[in-house]
């Protein structure tokens, strides 16, 4: 992309646990050295499956991991869709302008288990913590924001849900019947 003079930017996503893998460091270092137009987006829900972040890294933030590669790192409230959009938009513009990559750490929360194969989050997270994060649910926050701006209502939501019900059922059926 950079070599061709395009303003395209590569996006890569990983979780907090992924930042402790060698491939992650190699990718950030390579991109930093060659000023590759790339965004490294890290979804930090505080756990690598069930291992707390404090038990997997000494870094105070995951955004700091970019510093050694000469890459700017920024932390954003991953539960705020508008904040994530703004930070991503600015980082994309930075990378597209030839300034090199950016690492974005989104502070977020995983409500359910990491996998469906026996991961029980109640073993490592408290009910109080879950309830606290529920108050910051991005869907509820966006609904409230749009409602306050007069752009959304319960009637609009109900109509949309009714409109897409069959489409969602069809997608689920296709996924259930998909050969892997």
Where are these regions (language model features)?
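Glycine-rich ThDP/TPP pyrophosphate-binding loop and its adjacent helix/strand module
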Residues: 1-177
């Amino acid at each position: 992309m950079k070599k061709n003079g395009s303003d395209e930017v590569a996006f890569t996503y990983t979780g907090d646990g992924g930042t402790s893998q060698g491939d992650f460091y190699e990718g950030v270092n390579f991109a930093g050295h060659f000023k590759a137009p790339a965004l490294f987006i890290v979804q930090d829900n505080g756990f690598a499956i069930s291992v707390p972040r404090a038990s997997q890294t000494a870094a105070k933030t995951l955004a700091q991991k970019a510093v050694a590669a000469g890459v700017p790192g920024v932390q954003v409230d991953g539960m705020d869709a508008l904040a994530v959009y703004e930070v991503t938009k600015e980082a994309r513009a930075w990378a597209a302008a030839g300034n090199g990559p950016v690492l974005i750490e989104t502070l977020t929360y995983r409500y359910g288990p990491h996998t469906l194969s026996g991961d029980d989050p109640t073993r490592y997270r408290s009910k109080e913590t879950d309830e606290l994060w529920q108050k910051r649910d991005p869907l509820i926050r966006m609904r409230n924001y749009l409602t306050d701006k007069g752009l959304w209502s319960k009637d609009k939501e109900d109509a949309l849900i009714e409109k897409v019900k069959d489409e969602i059922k069809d997608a689920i059926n296709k996924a259930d019947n998909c050969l892997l």
